[in-house]
């Protein structure tokens, strides 16, 4: 992979990681169009590792929130009186909500990295989950806010987040849809989606580094991977700021329309043989 491709893919990762359009789906499509074998271990590892850039963008953007949550969590561990504090309960809720995707990701690791990366799955998932997003956006009451989030909310959202292991579903699209169906408002579910992303993405990247470091070195190359990660960080930071402002005033309709168009295009290209599915 050359530097220009790394910069391009890093920018796409940073832009799409937190938008409900599936960053992994986009990377899978683009890696295929750039001539890479999307089933190669080095390509699947590259796709997971560059998400770390988006994670660090989240940590930087929400640094004050994380500092507050960690302080409350630490006090709650030491002092039972703090255990009813909203920040303490929210911290535990995020931890609980992160467990399901870790368990499912490990259990189905081989299928996620091979079979599910087929463009048939990507295109179909983009279209099918658009219907779920549209339904959630339409029926969600949005009467509950971030301070109302409970461990039951994050557990349900965390279970639904497992669907995002299928490229094309979108981790943020899954968590936001589940949150809306739990009655949370758009800003609350968007912020919660950011918080839930950190354990999931860091664990996925760490697993790839530990198990496929040699594949990266021999294939894509660590220089290209590091460059893409840095670009992902910069673009993701801007995307986070934009999304929070956008979602406070608009529905998910623009993302749903985009997903439908992209999914239909992908399926057309594969069905006509213009692009192979794997």
Swiss-Prot record:
Bacitracin is thought to be involved in the inhibition of peptidoglycan synthesis by sequestering undecaprenyl diphosphate, thereby reducing the pool of lipid carrier available. GO terms for cellular component: plasma membrane. This is Undecaprenyl-diphosphatase 3. The chain crosses the membrane at residues 42-62, 88-108, 119-139, 187-207, 224-244, 254-274. The lineage of its organism: Bacteria, Bacillati, Actinomycetota, Actinomycetes, Frankiales. InterPro entries: UppP. One of its GO terms (biological process) is peptidoglycan biosynthetic process. Catalyzes the dephosphorylation of undecaprenyl diphosphate (UPP). Confers resistance to bacitracin. It is a multi-pass membrane protein.
